Amino acid sequence: MGPVPEEHQRESETVASNGANESGAAVTGIPQREAKHVSGTAVSGLAKRYASALYSYAGDSGDLDGVIARIEALGRLIDESADLRSLLGSPLVDVNRARDAVLAVLDRQGFTRIERNFVGTVANNRRLGSLRSIISAFAVLVAEKRGEAVAVVESAHELTEVQEHQLRASLIEAGYGNVRIEKHVDPSLLGGLVVRIGTRLYDTSLKSRLQRLQYAMKGAA
């Protein structure tokens, strides 16, 4: 039998039920079987699906505001810990070991069963590398539900207080006075910033500039 077309693979994905897995109850609405490799656009769509499932899961728990606050704290924890980011993004670490290590961190930091079940489901689906993107997508969804605008800001290093103040001033100057900033550390950017506000993208990263230089050099060759 030949390979199954991608659209049929998507249609055949099962959705998590309320049954338990190794890490606790699965989060309703999250695909339990997924293709291993996805494009950047697909990753964005995947993050939104997980974020939507988490929002529904949190709402059903009766502690939506508490879950929102703790997921925000988890995002900050990832941004502040190079070791944790390395663990999440490493293809060399066994999936089960990575899951257990991350869940141990959540236990030590006082996260609840809700966050533990969610992260466990993400890990079991081999999506720990997308966890920070999922958290950012969750923040955007929360802002939309509240009628707020949100700027997702990716930087190679955690922004200092001065840099964040300068960024907010630049956003105000650009007409985004009442916007919430969702920060995300991505060392692969090398330097500069990537700012997403709705469908608008502002990319001043060193990585992007180097890529443009490479394209220009290839075109001149």
UniProtKB/Swiss-Prot annotation:
Its Gene Ontology cellular component terms are: plasma membrane; proton-transporting ATP synthase complex
What InterPro entries is this protein classified in?
Answer: ATP_synth_OSCP/delta_N_sf (IPR026015), ATPase_OSCP/d_CS (IPR020781), ATPase_OSCP/dsu (IPR000711)
The Gene Ontology terms for molecular function here are: proton-transporting ATP synthase activity, rotational mechanism
Per the record, membrane topology reads: Peripheral membrane protein
Q: What is known about what this protein does?
A: F(1)F(0) ATP synthase produces ATP from ADP in the presence of a proton or sodium gradient. F-type ATPases consist of two structural domains, F(1) containing the extramembraneous catalytic core and F(0) containing the membrane proton channel, linked together by a central stalk and a peripheral stalk. During catalysis, ATP synthesis in the catalytic domain of F(1) is coupled via a rotary mechanism of the central stalk subunits to proton translocation. This protein is part of the stalk that links CF(0) to CF(1). It either transmits conformational changes from CF(0) to CF(1) or is implicated in proton conduction.
Tell me which PANTHER family the record gives.
ATP SYNTHASE DELTA CHAIN (PTHR11910)
> Which family is it part of?
Belongs to the ATPase delta chain family.
**Which protein, by its recorded name, is this?**
ATP synthase subunit delta
Q: Which organism is it from?
A: Granulibacter bethesdensis (strain ATCC BAA-1260 / CGDNIH1)
Report the gene name. atpH
